[in-house]
Amino acid sequence: MEWLKQAAKACYSQLVRFVSRRAVRDKLSKEIVYLMSFPSNNQGLIEALRRDYPVTVMYTSDCRKEAEALAKQQVSILPLDNPFVFFWQCVPLMTRSRVVICDNYFPFLGYLQKHSDAVFVQIWHATGAIKTFGYEDRQLKHRTKKDLARFTSVYQSFDYYVVASKQMADVFQRSYGAREEQMLYFGLPRTDQFVQLRKAQTEQQDQTADHKKVIVYTPTYREGQTELPLLDIPKMAKELGDSYRLIVRLHPHVQKLADKVPHTPFVSWDGHLQPTAQLLETADLLITDYSSVVFDYTLLKQRASVIYFWYDREQYEEKTGLQPHLTELLNGPV
């Protein structure tokens, strides 16, 4: 069936090229397109932009609720996962727009016929990076030359990267082949909320003496994952149940694995229902593995308590890869 998959990719790429080549002849508009694949990542950026410019949010299925909330504020939205809408509305609009803002890697950008005066900006979906990606992804050695060329065409579509640190700028330069002059050291809009919440916590502590401490567990996504993470929750409940409660937030791609898992007085599996900032604000302790959410938590909490649960470190490092010198930067035990 591999030939069928390759044929589908070829048809997809040719159709994107065909539609965008026709649209690129049109006059460039003042439209700003925001490509959204991560919820709770824009934090007011879209609302601020729409005060002065027409903005259209193109979203993946994981962001449907957030997109619909924006639509109620009179923001134009288009689903990327609807083939008809994608080819006949999204692609032409992206091609004609002066600015395209991206929060992730979007494969179709490599096929898009880009207007010479258009600007594509990568704002990413994380403050920092723990695992490797792009050219540093361990799986790259198993990909074909055609795949590598396709990845490169996507990386080269970005004109600028919004970053909050030199470390993250270095990551993009290694992972996407970006250049230093493409880095915009503005800080990320998504992190403002954590700084504001941190100030509020300092000014007002609302915990009571009988407050049960909250552990938040945020495992990252693993390719092909079909089972829940290996955290020994029954043992935790036995040892900690009197003083703690556990909230699990799975990656959106695997949340369905927990749909039929019962909640107990100790553990709940509905962390995905809360915005990231709100969930982390409640946490007295964060347990994670390779998730970049730890950077958000560190910004939010003055005394951030973190445990890194790397039960599959060797396999993960071999399959995906971890950032160099990572262990020197960790703020908690492994």
Q: What are these model-derived regions, one by one?
A:
Residues L285, S292-V334:
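Catalytic binding pocket for nucleotide-activated donors in carbohydrate/polymer assembly enzymes
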Residues N41-Y53, R174-S175, M183-K260:
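Conserved catalytic-core segment of nucleotide-activated headgroup transferases in glycan assembly
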Residues D81-M94, P252-F295:
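Donor nucleotide-activated moiety binding/catalytic core segment of transferases
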Residues I77, H115-D192:
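Active-site-proximal region of nucleotide-activated glycan assembly enzymes
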Residues Y34-L35, P92-F108:
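Short N-terminal targeting/anchoring amphipathic segment
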Residues M1-Q89, V99:
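N-terminal pre-catalytic "stem/leader" segment of glycosyltransferase-like enzymes
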Residues V100-I101, D159-S165, I247, L286-I287:
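A short beta-strand/loop micro-motif in the catalytic core of glycosyltransferases
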Residues M58-Q73, L240-D270:
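Catalytic donor nucleotide-activated moiety binding site of glycosyltransferases and closely related
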